[in-house]
């Protein structure tokens, strides 16, 4: 669940950069267990990165008993605001949300109890947001294990976890649709990220299978609608090593 999120080409304000405005890629990330909150880095080419504000936190976590800000995911919404979600704890039934006009001053942090309706929920990990311009809808999605569900893929070596991707939609971050199962293709899955690509949506995901044959790789699925259904996964796009936390960068030339 270690991941660095939010790569997009944006115009960063003078206050954030400490210099004149500049169009760059921005990288959101956390350090350690996420105790000190949101960190940001910039890049002009998507390959060489410089941390901002001396690699100190832009926002301290306030939610849950653990007060963590892991896996921060930020997008620019249709309203021009920066919208961020994050993992607030290893074991909570919800996620964190905040918004900002400039990445410096943030709204009040809000706990969204996305899995509070379910018994046996173990976690809500690595939430992300994708915006559908056509419908004006935001979809928030994350990985959860529910005790007693998908027992055929429970992994004894990993605390009997068996994750699937769940989601909710909203247009205003005030009211949310009922949580629904977003992705289940018969294996444990975490760390999904979805981008629009023309008339389709592309999901990059981690196959979390450890036994009998370890996968731990990144695969790709496709859907005509943001809410799915998503196709069966591709073959791994990563090599013979364990990978997780994919982030997608669309370069300035659109590739």
Q: Where do the model's predicted regions map?
A:
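Sec-dependent N-terminal signal peptides
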Residues: 4-16
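Carbohydrate-active catalytic/glycan-binding domains of CAZyme proteins
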Residues: 18-255
């Amino acid at each position: 669940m270690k991941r660095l999120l939010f790569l997009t080409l944006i115009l960063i304000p003078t206050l954030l950069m400490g210099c004149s405005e500049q169009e760059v890629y921005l990288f959101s990330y956390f350090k350690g267990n996420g105790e000190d909150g949101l960190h940001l880095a910039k890049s002009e080419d998507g390959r060489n990165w410089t941390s901002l504000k001396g690699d100190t936190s832009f926002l301290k976590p306030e939610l849950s008993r653990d007060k963590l800000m892991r896996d921060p995911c930020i997008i620019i919404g249709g309203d021009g605001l920066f919208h961020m979600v994050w993992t607030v704890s290893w074991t909570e039934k919800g996620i964190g949300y905040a918004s900002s006009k400039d990445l410096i001053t943030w709204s009040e942090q809000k706990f969204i109890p996305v899995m509070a309706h379910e018994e046996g929920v173990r976690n809500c990990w690595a939430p992300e947001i994708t915006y559908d311009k056509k419908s004006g809808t935001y979809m928030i999605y994350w990985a959860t294990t529910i005790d007693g569900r998908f027992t055929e893929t429970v992994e004894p070596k990993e605390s009997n976890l068996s994750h699937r991707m769940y989601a909710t939609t909203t247009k205003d971050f005030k009211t949310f649709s009922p949580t629904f199962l977003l992705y289940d293709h018969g294996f444990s899955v975490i760390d999904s990220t979805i981008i629009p690509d023309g008339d389709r949506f592309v999901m990059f995901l981690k196959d979390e299978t450890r036994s009998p044959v370890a996968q731990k790789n990144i695969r790709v699925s496709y859907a005509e609608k943001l809410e799915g259904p998503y196709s069966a996964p591709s073959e791994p796009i990563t090599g013979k090593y364990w990978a997780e936390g994919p982030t997608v960068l669309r370069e300035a030339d659109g590739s």
